[in-house]
């Protein structure tokens, strides 16, 4: 899985760098600004540079931001772990509602305005139409949201609620050339039409 993600990101970055050659600001300059924006935001919060053993994340609005990847492109603050006995497996539908905020505005002191689908209730399942297939990075309908939004589901359960920082390299591929880091307020759901299978405790088997 990691090799597939790395290859896809590499191809996307190559195309982004080529498309940025004619811009007044270089791709490197834009990446530098992105890092400054993220670092400024994180400087106002606690940061843990690794994933805790057994996913023992601190929870709540004062919890730290945990670095989820080796490159420092994804950071997560856990507001709710959700149902840890109800977790997705490969190709399960994961519905999500979110608001996202442009963190470059944080650096310039502008108001952060959230944009997203948090009020989307279209669809027979009542969860809206926005979903990805868990751990599937091949189908465009799933990969179009990037790798960052899937990361919390490696560690959390249904109805998990997190604040998630996603740099452009792990964000939506069609927006990668913009080099904008986003802060997501996102909640994940299992579909009632095809629910994830609950895990059984070893002591209760």
Where are the predicted features?
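Bacterial N-terminal signal peptides that target proteins for export
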Residues: 1-9
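Cross-family detector of peptidyl-prolyl cis-trans isomerase
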Residues: 5, 21-205
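C-terminal motif of bacterial Sec signal peptides marking the signal peptidase cleavage site
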Residues: 16-20
